């Protein structure tokens, strides 16, 4: 760390053209706007600069250079060995390289690295090229994606692959702008990640990890979801990205946020850009305030009420939080509550054992195209759920005995914006229904169910049914139909795969003033 700090001090002597370079570092673009949109954008830039203190900027080109150098040196030594990084580095074909990055970035959205590794490996083994994915069926895509969540990601990924093959001659767009414009489901971040990692385009990215790093190094405490703050963060990312190694730089910034500059208990003493971090400096100022003499540490020159990037008066600095004061979490609406009744219908099977009935969800909306047990949506005070569910079952199976419909309990599953409570029922048939399953329905063995394109919520329902059918208590030993990967998540005391890809670092608390 002393070497890293020394590299910052080494930039005190500035060349003769420093003033010109510093001016360039302050602005991401000096181009004269050629349209009304360009003029509007320039006006927004001017208003933003007028309301922002240099405290929240990288005003000195020496700091930009040091940030790049220190971060990349750390990344070269500490980066995790991940399959998508190896593919991006080793693949000579630029289209395959871009495809490999694309798949990883889509899978990593809202999903932990440890979870993605297995899915990514199986995906690339099954569909190593864009053309392979384009020719696959949506059912195959949903089946492999089962359990990963946010299922529209897989569908849009395949839609994008088909567009590249059918409309773009099999060649991926080469820039962040065209990637975002031409490919469905590709937003600004994903486009920038693909363009910088696969094609070396000098473009910055801002994901959740980068956002946290930037908010801390420049002490940005305003709502990170606001248009003004988001615009400022993207400007910072574009200013900082290393022109010689844009892909590595972006991955390094994400890696720093994921492994060192974490949401809770960040490892500040191991941070390669600690000496440039405003949040860390503020913690140090608090710790040194009791010593003789006031430490010379820069602060925001504007009044807090004037600066639109500082912590607000309604949410001031909390010494106990340390650097975790940044970024401040935006208020989130609680997920809306919905209720459903679902039933596991079983009929006697042959060699493969009993069969359960699955029906396919609509092609759009929540869990589009996935398979589930027959279900009906209920009102919270629904008094006749038994009758409503039986009517739904008869739609798929024909006349059924109501007296055999048995209530097993309830399963709660929380999606990103919905808390869904399932009332779980079972119905055992003595023989197969008189009619065959209609379109949109099918009978599967237990083993087939575990490998089908079903949601995690349905696997929870099936586990309740499994436990009840086998007459076992929760936690007792029994044979498992579904493989462990599709069952419960590891407990808090159990190591997850991600831990094997991190260098062991002892926990410290340099971010707290209560040391």
UniProtKB/Swiss-Prot annotation:
Tissue: Expressed in heart, lung, liver, intestine, brain and thymus.
Region entry Disordered, spans: 1-38, 468-494
Gene3D superfamilies associated with the record: Helix-hairpin-Helix base-excision DNA repair enzymes (C-terminal) (1.10.1670.10), Hypothetical protein, domain 2 (1.10.340.30), Nucleoside Triphosphate Pyrophosphohydrolase (3.90.79.10)
Segments forming domain Nudix hydrolase: 335-466
Cofactor(s) the protein needs: [4Fe-4S] cluster
Cofactor: how bound: Binds 1 [4Fe-4S] cluster. The cluster does not appear to play a role in catalysis, but is probably involved in the proper positioning of the enzyme along the DNA strand.
GO cellular component terms attached to this protein's record: mitochondrion; nucleoplasm
A biological process term (GO) from this entry: negative regulation of necroptotic process
Residues the record marks as site: Transition state stabilizer: 207
Primary localization: nucleus
One MF annotation (Gene Ontology) recorded for this entry: MutSalpha complex binding
Catalytic machinery residues: 105 (proton donor/acceptor)
UniProt keyword annotation of Membrane present: no
Sequence positions that bind [4Fe-4S] cluster: 261, 268, 271, 277
Compartments (UniProt record): Nucleus; Mitochondrion
Reaction it catalyzes: Hydrolyzes free adenine bases from 7,8-dihydro-8-oxoguanine:adenine mismatched double-stranded DNA, leaving an apurinic site
Ranges of biased composition (kind: Basic residues): 1-24
EC number of this enzyme: 3.2.2.31
Keywords recorded for this protein, A-Z: 4Fe-4S, DNA damage, DNA repair, Glycosidase, Hydrolase, Iron, Iron-sulfur, Metal-binding, Mitochondrion, Nucleus
InterPro entries with a match to the protein in the record: DNA_glycosylase, Endonuclease-III-like_CS2, Endonuclease3_FeS-loop_motif, Endouclease-III_FeS-bd_BS, HhH-GPD_domain, HhH_base_excis_C, HhH_motif, MIG/MutY
Domain of life assignment: Eukaryota
Chain span(s) of sequence motif Nudix box: 376-398
PANTHER family reported in the protein's UniProt record: ADENINE DNA GLYCOSYLASE (PTHR42944:SF1)
Function: Involved in oxidative DNA damage repair. Initiates repair of A*oxoG to C*G by removing the inappropriately paired adenine base from the DNA backbone. Possesses both adenine and 2-OH-A DNA glycosylase activities.
Family the entry assigns: Belongs to the Nth/MutY family.
Entry protein name: Adenine DNA glycosylase
Higher taxonomy: Eukaryota, Metazoa, Chordata, Craniata, Vertebrata
């Amino acid at each position: 760390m002393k070497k890293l700090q020394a590299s910052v001090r080494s930039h005190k002597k500035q060349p003769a053209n420093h003033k010109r370079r510093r001016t360039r570092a302050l602005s991401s673009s000096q181009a004269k706007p050629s349209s009304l949109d360009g003029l509007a954008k320039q006006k927004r830039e001017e208003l933003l600069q007028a309301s922002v203190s240099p405290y929240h900027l990288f005003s000195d080109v020496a700091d930009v250079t040091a940030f790049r150098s220190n971060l990349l040196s750390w990344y070269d030594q500490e980066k995790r060995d991940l399959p998508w990084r190896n593919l991006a580095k080793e693949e000579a074909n630029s289209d395959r390289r871009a495809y490999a990055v694309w798949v990883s970035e889509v899978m990593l959205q809202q999903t932990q690295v440890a979870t993605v590794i297995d899915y990514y490996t199986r995906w690339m083994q099954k569909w190593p090229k864009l053309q392979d994915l384009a020719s696959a069926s949506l059912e195959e895509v949903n089946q492999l994606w089962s359990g990963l969540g946010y299922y529209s990601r897989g569908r849009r990924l395949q839609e994008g692959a088909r567009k590249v093959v059918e409309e773009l001659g099999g060649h991926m767009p080469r820039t962040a702008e065209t990637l975002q414009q031409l490919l469905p489901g590709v937003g600004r971040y994903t486009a920038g990640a693909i363009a910088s990692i696969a094609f070396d385009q000098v473009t910055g990215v801002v994901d959740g990890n980068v956002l946290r790093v930037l908010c801390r190094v420049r002490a940005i405490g305003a709502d990170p979801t606001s248009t003004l703050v988001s615009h400022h963060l993207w400007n910072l990312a574009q200013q900082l990205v290393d022109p010689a190694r844009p892909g590595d730089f972006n991955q390094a910034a994400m890696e720093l946020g994921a492994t060192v500059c974490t949401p809770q208990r960040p490892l500040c003493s191991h941070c390669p850009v600690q000496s440039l971090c405003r949040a860390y400096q503020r913690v140090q100022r608090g710790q040194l305030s009791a010593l003789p003499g006031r430490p010379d540490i820069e602060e925001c020159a504007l009044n807090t009420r004037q600066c639109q990037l500082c912590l607000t008066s309604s949410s001031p600095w909390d010494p106990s939080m340390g650097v975790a004061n940044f970024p401040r979490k935006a208020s989130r609406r609680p997920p809306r509550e919905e209720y459903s009744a679902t039933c596991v219908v079983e009929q006697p099977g042959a060699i493969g054992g009993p069969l359960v009935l699955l029906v396919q969800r609509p092609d759009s909306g929540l869990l589009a195209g996935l398979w589930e047990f027959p279900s009906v949506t209920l009102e919270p005070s629904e008094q006749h759920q038994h009758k409503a569910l039986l009517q739904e079952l008869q739609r798929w199976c024909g006349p059924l005995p109501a007296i055999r419909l048995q209530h097993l309990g309830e399963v709660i599953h929380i999606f990103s914006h919905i808390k869904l409570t399932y009332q779980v029922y079972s119905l055992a048939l003595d023989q197969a229904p008189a009619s065959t399953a209609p379109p949109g329905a099918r009978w599967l063995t237990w083993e087939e169910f575990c490998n089908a394109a079903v949601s995690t919520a349905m696997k929870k329902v099936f586990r309740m049914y499994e436990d009840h059918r086998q007459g076992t208590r929760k936690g007792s030993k029994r044979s498992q139909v579904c493989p462990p990967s599709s069952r419960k998540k590891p407990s808090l005391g159990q190591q997850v795969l991600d831990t094997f890809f991190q260098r062991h670092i002892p926990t410290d608390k340099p971010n707290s003033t209560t040391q």
